[in-house]
Design a protein with these regions (language model features):
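Conserved acetyl-CoA-binding loop of GNAT-fold acetyltransferases
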Residues: 119, 135-145
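Conserved GNAT acetyl-CoA-binding A-motif
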Residues: 107, 114-126
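Conserved beta-strand in the GNAT
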Residues: 56, 62-71, 87, 92
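Conserved acetyl-CoA pyrophosphate-binding loop and the N-cap/start of the following alpha-helix
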Residues: 97, 101-109
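Conserved GNAT-fold acetyl-CoA-binding loop/helix
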Residues: 21-42, 52
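A short helix-loop-beta-strand connector motif used in the catalytic cores of GNAT acetyltransferases and
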Residues: 41-56, 87
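A short beta-loop-alpha structural element at the N-terminal edge
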Residues: 1-15
């Protein structure tokens, strides 16, 4: 079953975020002591306000896949236009549930919502391994946006 998350899901989403982060290692990196508190605050308030919409797929009563979309309202213009931009992030499916089409159905739910909500575009920074997956679900490479990175950002 695919549905939008509620604040009741936040603790499980935090656990999945931790799993997702450490799946590809980060051995030796310092753990944030405030992770759960910070995650819970940001995601709970985001869900309540509508700034973040989170889709989850469940199997046997547990969340097995999710995708987060943060919305950015556009400044109005005096012509007809779409109202928002969506930042798609934290897309994850538990390893034991991959290859079953679950993540694709979650992405399809996200893009259906975007169409219905008049979102102008969804942007995502895919890994090399996930690029083909996004392309199969309607995402296209439009070139890199210009970005400013904090001087201390490891990226």
């Amino acid at each position: 079953m695919i549905r939008t998350a509620t604040v009741d899901d936040v603790a499980e989403l935090a656990e999945l975020r931790r799993t997702f982060t450490f799946e590809d290692s980060t051995e030796g990196e310092a753990l944030r002591s405030d992770f759960e508190e910070s995650f819970t605050h940001l995601v709970s308030s985001g869900i309540r306000s509508g700034r973040w919409v989170v889709w989850v797929a469940e199997a046997a009563g547990a969340i097995v896949s999710h995708a987060f979309v943060g919305t950015i309202e556009k400044i109005p213009r005096p012509i007809a236009e779409h109202r928002a931009i969506g930042y798609l992030t934290n897309v994850y499916t538990r390893p034991e549930f991959r290859g079953r089409g679950i993540g694709g159905r979650v992405l399809d739910a996200v893009t259906a919502w975007a169409r219905e909500s008049d979102v102008e575009l969804l942007m995502v920074w895919p890994s090399e391994a996930s690029l083909a997956h996004y392309e199969r679900h309607g995402f296209a490479d439009r070139g890199e946006p210009l970005v400013w990175l904090h001087p201390e950002d490891p990226a």
